[in-house]
């Protein structure tokens, strides 16, 4: 009995202790919660995102105005090789007067300029005369030479109405037909491309006939030029009749009322008579469509060939009755002076002169500009 009471008492005491402990813990928990509530609320920190450091915008390059170089300047640059390798050697030659030794040096220099034997002979006769007068300096010699060469070229150049060569829209409403001839390698195809480009730039309508049907590469090259210029090109299968292509090109030009019809031609060696006859046939077939065509027949001459070009020119002239010349590649030759004797001997004017690869490097030939660029005169 006593044992039962003792056991009950122990249980009651244990429960009481447990309740007290739980109550104490609950009170402490409330106290802790109250303390936490009384604490200042912490501010929420936004995550820190570093701003991307933008590199400063690159300074805008200053707008470069397109510098348009005049053809006169292009001509000076283009003829620099002839000027430096030949005429530049005049420096110092006249100091102390012209003795016989210096006269011989001057004569050799003039022959090297490729202006022609007859021209040099006549020139030296006058130089001897002026030297005796004792008033021949480097500057006065250049002026004398300028006047002398101009007198040789001007009578031929002035025979021609140079308005024919200007890059203008037709003012007559009639298609102008230009036939371009020359040996392979002289620069015919490139020259035609430049002519077409310059004419199109001035607003003229142009039809080009690719009559050199035996050189596919030349036809493709011409096609590129025409596509860029916006000119119409008439071509045929490789090996087609060249005169037939010329006829078709002129027919297309007339149908379109184009300002110009420019015809490329075969460029085999001038010694092949049958090929020269082929050119004559190409010329004559055009007259079926226009009795006055072609209005110009221009021979392209590579300046590098110098005096050797005379033989070529004579053969072409005899067959086709040329109306003028186009002097090309003057920038790559020291023989640009050969233009003087070629003009004088053939009695044919130079229509255009080329001094580089672009269309801007081809322009109407002007005697004064040419001679000043050749001799290094302002």
What are these regions (language model features)?
Residues 1-152, 156, 161-165, 173-174, ...:
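Non-catalytic terminal/linker segments enriched in charged/polar, low-complexity residues
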């Amino acid at each position: 009995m006593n044992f039962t009471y003792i056991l009950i008492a122990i249980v009651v005491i244990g429960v009481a202790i447990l309740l007290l402990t739980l109550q104490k813990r609950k009170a402490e928990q409330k106290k802790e919660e109250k303390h936490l509530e009384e604490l200042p609320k912490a501010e929420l920190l936004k995550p820190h995102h570093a701003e991307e450091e933008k590199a400063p915008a690159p300074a805008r390059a200053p707008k470069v105005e397109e510098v348009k170089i005049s053809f006169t300047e292009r001509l000076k640059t283009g003829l620099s090789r002839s000027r430096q390798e030949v005429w530049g050697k005049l420096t110092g030659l006249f100091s102390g007067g012209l003795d016989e030794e210096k006269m011989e040096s001057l004569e050799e220099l003039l022959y090297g300029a490729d202006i022609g034997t007859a021209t040099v002979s006549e020139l030296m006769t006058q130089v001897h005369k002026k030297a005796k007068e004792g008033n021949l300096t480097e500057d006065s010699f250049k002026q004398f030479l300028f006047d002398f060469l101009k007198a040789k070229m001007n009578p031929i150049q002035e025979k021609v109405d140079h308005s024919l060569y200007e890059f203008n829209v037709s003012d007559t409403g009639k298609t102008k037909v230009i036939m371009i001839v020359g040996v392979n390698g002289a620069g015919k195809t490139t020259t035609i491309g430049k002519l077409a480009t310059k004419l199109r730039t001035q607003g003229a309508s142009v039809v080009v006939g690719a009559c050199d049907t035996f050189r596919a590469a030349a036809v493709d090259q011409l096609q590129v030029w025409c596509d860029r210029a916006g000119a119409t090109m008439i071509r045929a299968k490789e090996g087609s009749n060249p005169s037939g292509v010329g006829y078709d090109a002129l027919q297309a030009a007339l149908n379109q009322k184009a300002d110009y019809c420019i015809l490329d031609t075969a460029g085999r060696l001038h010694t092949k008579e049958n090929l020269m006859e082929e050119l004559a046939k190409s010329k004559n077939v055009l007259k079926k469509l226009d009795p006055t065509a072609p209005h110009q027949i221009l021979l392209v001459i590579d300046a590098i060939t110098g005096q050797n070009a005379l033989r070529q020119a004579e053969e072409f002239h005899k067959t086709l009755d040329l109306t003028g010349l186009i002097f090309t590649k003057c920038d790559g030759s020291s023989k640009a002076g050969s233009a003087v004797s070629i003009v004088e001997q053939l009695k044919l004017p130079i229509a255009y002169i080329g001094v580089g690869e672009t269309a801007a490097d081809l322009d109407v030939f002007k005697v004064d500009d040419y001679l000043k660029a050749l001799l290094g005169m302002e």
